């Protein structure tokens, strides 16, 4: 097999003192119960903050997990490691033909995990009902602007209508609450935030605005060029009354604000300016079978090699535990020596 190099060291050291049973824990006592599963690195958009206009060299098909391999890892995660929430991501998960099969197989596990999907919404209008029937509980749809010109400039595709149709279909199919994930453009983002919130309020969607993170394929991210939570909230407050939500945040990444005295909320995920790593409960599985204990991890643990080498479930479970045991205290974005991970977001999964 020819392996596409991603420049990421692989964990090979033993994890001294690591628990071999019980929750999926790290040395700081954080317990991972939320699994992010990247089904593919392919995407049908070319968002400026994610990849170049010409796209990327996709991972070869033989390096990707098969549906059966993925389902086996999902079973281990849920029945042995205590995973209670599974989110399917990409790339773009809707380009994966066996998506509904994987969702259905995951829903058949016991205890049944909560299942969500993050998607750009293109093609969702045609598949929302089938995904709901397969067992998917809810969706987050990435939408950075409801201005057609802004959307086309950000995504390099004229597909806003398809995304809006996907949102409507998801709501109709019962994939609720429907959430909208927005990464704001530095030039138009403050205006876009206001119009996005109005659109979401009008249609019954929940808006989540995410600070742009250094995960772009071209490594062009600049702290000073990205909009941060304080500025975003100030722009929203010029048009809406925002009151902090009284519900405990727990491990949720979004700080929620109630809008105009009603029950609707808007969330801001301040991954860079107000990191929440101490409450992180996530573990990540890439489309090519690598476990990552953080979006910004510099190391990975290769479960695909174990799968294809004949390892039993016990060995795979312990390898996954070892990967999470060594999770760093935080992502380190604000540290002087921070290095952006070699994998772009499209090959990690959101």
From Swiss-Prot:
It comes from the Bacteria. Its cofactor is [4Fe-4S] cluster. [4Fe-4S] cluster 2 binds at residues 277, 280, 294. Residues 27-245 form the Radical SAM core domain. The keyword Nucleotide-binding applies. It catalyses: GTP + AH2 + S-adenosyl-L-methionine = (8S)-3',8-cyclo-7,8-dihydroguanosine 5'-triphosphate + 5'-deoxyadenosine + L-methionine + A + H(+). GTP binds at residues 36, 87, 118, 179, 282-284. It is an enzyme of class 4 (lyase). GO terms for molecular function: 4 iron, 4 sulfur cluster binding; cyclic pyranopterin monophosphate synthase activity; GTP 3',8'-cyclase activity; GTP binding; metal ion binding; S-adenosyl-L-methionine binding. The keyword 4Fe-4S applies. Pathway: Cofactor biosynthesis; molybdopterin biosynthesis. Its EC number is 4.1.99.22. InterPro entries: Aldolase_TIM, Elp3/MiaA/NifB-like_rSAM, MoaA, MoaA_NifB_PqqE_Fe-S-bd_CS, MoaA_twitch, MoCo_biosynth_MoaA/MoaC, rSAM. GO terms for biological process: Mo-molybdopterin cofactor biosynthetic process. Keywords: 4Fe-4S, GTP-binding, Iron, Iron-sulfur, Lyase, Metal-binding, Molybdenum cofactor biosynthesis, Nucleotide-binding, S-adenosyl-L-methionine. Monomer and homodimer. Belongs to the radical SAM superfamily. MoaA family. Catalyzes the cyclization of GTP to (8S)-3',8-cyclo-7,8-dihydroguanosine 5'-triphosphate. This is GTP 3',8-cyclase. It comes from Mycobacterium sp. (strain KMS). The lineage of its organism: Bacteria, Bacillati, Actinomycetota, Actinomycetes, Mycobacteriales.
